From Swiss-Prot:
Belongs to the peptidase M20B family. Cleaves the N-terminal amino acid of tripeptides. This is Peptidase T. The lineage of its organism: Bacteria, Bacillati, Bacillota, Bacilli, Bacillales. SUPFAM superfamilies: Bacterial exopeptidase dimerisation domain, Zn-dependent exopeptidases. Its EC number is 3.4.11.4. Disulfide bonds: none annotated. It catalyses: Release of the N-terminal residue from a tripeptide. CDD domains: M20_peptT.
Length: 408
């Protein structure tokens, strides 16, 4: 199967599907259609009925080959790649029998070094796909697409493997947080699903952050600095004051595990107007609400010193911890856990310090945990995919549909 995985991943990663957060269309970029149309053709060649809507959501069905009435399971992956780094002219490189020594990426000065990325030490002997140092790879989440497609191919070639109805979904714009925004849960018509969008071997994730964005707008009064005493209000300094009132220890670079944070993503301005953009994250719903409350309290504390209330705050929720919807349905986690055990894969159920499409889909009525893909260092030139771990991910998909058929 390795050669098929390499060929398919190469074919998909060389198609530029970068999403654009500034766009107002869905998909956010026309080039995402290039991969969507290719996948539509490939699914149809496998004999699967497909449904590609005007927003770039591609659904397909592999019909049940058993008489028993078992739950319909879905498998999901996103076609877009991150806007954080160059995604054009991707030139995948193959490392056979990886030896954990530093590897120079193409003709660049970039080096894939286990001292910097220690998780590479667990991949000794694996076949890796990496970049040439000039682009991201796009294995996030094209590896997930490959794994779903190869699992479907295998099931088609092995009709003796019993399974219920399987729904497949390939979606746009996950990287800019809009993946589920126009996802039609009723049209997808699955009882539950799994995103193939994790990273390291053994990841099985069903806890995500609660997430919000806060935009702080500071309005100043611009006066000639020579006569500014008791008259000027510097919006930039108001922004600095606002940020200084948040706890220094509760930032991404000083937190881990279940610890939440405030993250200042952008700060720009002039004397007259400054804008701060934060993301707020916490696994605990109560702490999440307290974090949002703290933002409002800081606004009020600063505004109390002025007559015209110069600091404005706009907070918007982005997604919530999917554990709230998944934990009441333990069979959704028990199924992959049984499969992992059968395949001797150690299950890593640590919480996601982020979110997936499943975070939103779970609250839309489609409970959706996340499963590993075998890739790492997403969104940049050091991205890689272990073909060996991808093969295991294919086996997990096959094992899940077998387990559902056997255990109903």
């Amino acid at each position: 199967m390795k050669n098929q995985l390499i060929d398919r991943l190469t074919r998909y990663t060389t198609i530029d599907t970068q999403s654009d957060p500034k766009s107002t269309t869905t998909p956010s970029t026309e080039k995402q259609w290039d991969l969507l149309h290719l996948l539509e053709r490939e699914l149809q060649q496998l004999g699967l009925p497909t449904d590609l809507d005007e927003n770039g959501y591609l659904f397909a069905t592999l019909e049940s080959n058993i008489d028993a009435d078992v739950p319909t399971v879905g498998f999901l992956a996103h076609v877009d790649t991150s806007p954080d780094f160059n995604a054009s002219n991707v030139k995948p490189q193959i490392i056979e029998n990886y030896d954990s020594k530093p590897y120079k990426l193409g003709n660049t000065k970039r080096v894939l070094d286990p001292k910097v990325f220690p998780e590479l030490n667990s991949l000794v002997g694996h076949t890796l796909m990496v970049t040439d140092g000039t682009s991201l790879l796009g294995a996030d989440d094209k590896a997930g697409i490959v794994e779903i497609m190869e699992a479907i191919c295998y099931l088609q070639e092995h009709p003796e493997i019993k399974h219920g109805t399987i729904r497949i979904g390939f979606t746009p714009d996950e990287e800019i947080g809009r993946g589920p925004h126009k996802f039609d849960v009723d049209r997808f018509n699955a009882d539950f699903a799994y995103t193939m969008d994790g990273s390291q071997y053994g990841e099985l994730q069903y806890e995500s952050f609660n997430a919000a964005e806060a935009v702080i707008t500071c309005h100043g009064v611009n006066v000639h600095p020579g006569s500014a005493k008791n008259a000027m209000v510097n919006a930039i300094r108001l922004g600095e004051q606002f940020d200084s009132l948040l706890p220094d220890s509760e930032v991404p670079e000083r937190t881990e595990g279940y610890e939440g944070f405030y993250h200042l993503m952008n700060f720009e301005g002039t004397v007259e107007k400054a804008t701060l953009q934060y993301i707020i994250r916490d696994h605990d719903k109560k702490q999440f609400e307290l974090r949002k409350k703290r933002i409002l309290e800081i606004r009020d504390d600063i505004n109390a010193h002025f007559e015209n209330y110069p600091v404005k705050v706009d907070i918007s929720d982005q997604y919530f911890n999917m554990a709230e919807k998944i934990l009441p349905l333990p069979h959704i986690i028990d199924i992959p856990k049984r499969v992992f055990a059968k395949l001797d894969i150690p299950a890593n159920t640590e919480p996601i310090r982020g979110g997936t499409d499943g975070s939103q889909l779970s609250f839309m009525g489609l409970p959706t945990p996340n499963i590993f893909t075998g890739c790492g260092n997403f969104h940049g030139p050091y991205e890689y995919a272990s073909i060996d771990v991808m093969e295991k991910a294919v086996q997990v998909i096959i094992g899940i549909v077998e387990d559902i058929a056997e255990n109903n």
